[in-house]
């Protein structure tokens, strides 16, 4: 489903004049170079029963999803070592592997003890070794942890594979009977649990910076209202109750404020509320549509979408006052801004001049260059991993709303497993303890 604001903004764009003076000649690129081959050998298992999870497969998928590594398929492996002393480096050199990981799982007093080691094939040196223990139910957590440790050791970038994701499903049973469900899962779509069910739409779920609360829009009162919910207890608090549109909540970096969109005074404008004092401040004041706020790291800069220049583009402003500065200049539509962790890259929904397709793209904020990451037609709601290496977004495949993951370097693009029905509105968690 195309975002409500997108539809409204597009209508306004076709009725508006072209933007002229601010256009810049900026390169648009796509594609990327080769990922590093890595072999994650199936872990040895010293127990009797079959384990419920394949550790090596989860680790391989995590490293693949980052876009940095290309796992070597198990069927291509010449040998299957499970500990460091069994690694024959010539086997992995023959396969072109740059790195090889081995591991072993041992039952110990009702728990599982996992030992693992990672090697540089060219130098034949061990670069990482470790131990982790847990229960059968924690196998997936331990696999994500090992992937996080390995990724950080090899790249210097903190791994984001132990994070979570929010999304909304919509299952239509009849014309007037649709069930909306707010789900939380692993970042890769596994282990989904239901946080909220409603017969009315749920929109724009967002994790708080502490990962313990979420904000979202609910139509349960037959009109849009913003709620904050505590994940562990399910306790909810209604934040807004204004006439008209109440939408697009975004957390400040310290979790003390929410930015959102209200139309109580006419057209949609961006406001910020202090959650402790409930003091409401208006940020934008323009005759155009201003929507989709996103906080910068400093807690005072807001990126947002506006058609004030004639077509939807991304701007930034200060919540304490001042004018808005245009950020995007390539294409006739740029919306739904998100920032990478280092704030060097802007992730957005982009439409090129002369085209009708909406795609996920990234803009280098220093150079202004734009790279398109996806090849689908109706992308929306991009959300960025806390380390900035991956993006999850909603799109359509075979007439159904689905979630996709794309690496920020464009090397990997794949669908995420989710429940039946229409799936939309993904939101990536921060790092979790």
UniProtKB/Swiss-Prot annotation:
Keyword presence, Cell cycle: yes
Cellular component terms (Gene Ontology): periplasmic space
Subcellular location: Periplasm
Coiled-coil regions listed in the entry: none
One Pfam family matching this protein: TolB_N
Subcellular location, principal: periplasm
Keyword Signal among UniProt keywords: yes
UniProt GO BP: cell division; protein import
Signal peptide start-end: 1-21
UniProt keywords, alphabetically: Cell cycle, Cell division, Periplasm, Signal
NCBIfam families: propeller_TolB
Subunit structure as annotated in this protein's UniProt entry: The Tol-Pal system is composed of five core proteins: the inner membrane proteins TolA, TolQ and TolR, the periplasmic protein TolB and the outer membrane protein Pal. They form a network linking the inner and outer membranes and the peptidoglycan layer.
Record function comment: Part of the Tol-Pal system, which plays a role in outer membrane invagination during cell division and is important for maintaining outer membrane integrity.
Family the UniProt entry places it in: Belongs to the TolB family.
HAMAP family membership: TolB (MF_00671)
Entries under PANTHER family matching the protein: PROTEIN TOLB, PROTEIN TOLB HOMOLOG
The protein, known as: Tol-Pal system protein TolB
Species annotation: Pseudomonas syringae pv. syringae (strain B728a)
Originating gene: tolB
